[in-house]
Amino acid sequence: MQRAGAGARRASDCGPAPYRPRCIAKLAQYVGSFPVDDLDTQESVGLVQQQLWALQDCSRRRAVILKFSLQGLKIYSGEGEVLLMAHALKRILYATWYPAACQFAFIARNPRSPSSKLFCHLFVGSQPGEVHILYLLLCRSFQLAYLLQHPEERAQSEPCLAPVGDLSLKPLCSPGVPPALVREPFSRDQLSQNVHALVSFRRLPAEGLLGSNGKELPESEGRGGTRHIRLGNPYCSPTLVRKKAIRSKVIRSGAYRGCTYETQLQLSAREAFPAAWEAWPRGPGGPSCLVENEGSLTENIWAFAGLSRSCALSLLRRDVHGAFLLWPEPGTSDQWSLSVRTQCGVVPHQVFRNHLGRFCLEHLPAEFPSLEALVESHAGVERSLFCPLSMGRLNPTYEEQDCGTEGRFPRTLRPLSHAKSEAELQGLG
């Protein structure tokens, strides 16, 4: 077991960075890191699961801050001053979580190190929800990064497993004009009671295509005159927004919550892949359809929202055993298709909602109040499905090696083989 220690660097010692991608910061407890054995992919994942189970009662913990973006994941000390780890997204292989032990873990390799030197980094939280959001953010980052790298594989229409609730974002489309996204009015439960929770309104989706009276602007104005709004209007700073809200007696202290996690990842994607972002056609399947609220993160990960079904199934065939995709059947609101990666390939199952509004798997008597409960029940239960559902996901954008002098090495999804190393993590001491 290795822990962050004296080898860590202060964030201020890294020098000024010309580009700072938007990120999402979350708190957690860092337990430690351990090397991954040199075994077959599935066997290595199984041994990692056993090791995580053995470490569930480990008392060696350290408060840290995890910062997610489409460029990667950074781990800072609890005060946010010391950078303990930095992993580019392309070097993170696998992510998983265990609700019973409140554990979140991911497998990654170090920069410029071979694919044989992989390490698993373990974090815990005080309750399952805390580690679940860490897992969701990392897995959705995997998917969004893949979508930006492969825009030709996008879906023509986005699947939706369930209503997203009160935080809907409505596209406004007109011929020749990119769709704008308008947020619904804020409700009481969307007002933060914490002044530190304020996030700038400039992180909201582009509102530049709408005038002050709510009408659409001409195409020339929408594309040119409002560009500065999309890129961040200085007059929409957090301080000014908060002061204006207090003066108008909308709130006493505090401010509006920021956009959703997915919205911030979307903006990060625009910055990380500007060429792909601009080349992506506006409309169904485009970047605007990737905007979603926190409550829909789980469903969009299950369905690999934004990717065509054939491409999603192709990626599923190369994932770990138990990985699955869950999407609604076209033309119906009461049936879903559950595809599970097994030892024999991808096995389809049918999920339906009965007359009582409860969810069931075809040919199985058990009923569940929600899709989440159904998935949780069939995770780790050998007798219910041919292969139990897995909480782990492989990163489809993982690269076994870094860029060389002659260009980028080909990507692959069999990175857990050839992993045998007792070397210490760089910068972890």
From Swiss-Prot:
GO terms for cellular component: postsynaptic density. Gene3D superfamilies: Pleckstrin-homology domain (PH domain)/Phosphotyrosine-binding domain (PTB) (2.30.29.30), SH2 domain (3.30.505.10). Highly expressed in brain, particularly in Purkinjie cells in the cerebellum and the cornu ammonis of the hippocampus. Residues 302-398 form the SH2 domain. It is found in: Postsynaptic density. Keywords: SH2 domain, Synapse. Its main location: other. It comes from the Eukaryota. InterPro entries: PH-like_dom_sf, PTB/PI_dom, SH2, SH2_dom_sf. SMART domains: PTB. Interacts with BCR. May be involved in synaptic plasticity regulation through the control of Rac-GTP levels. This is SH2 domain-containing protein 5. It comes from Mus musculus (Mouse).
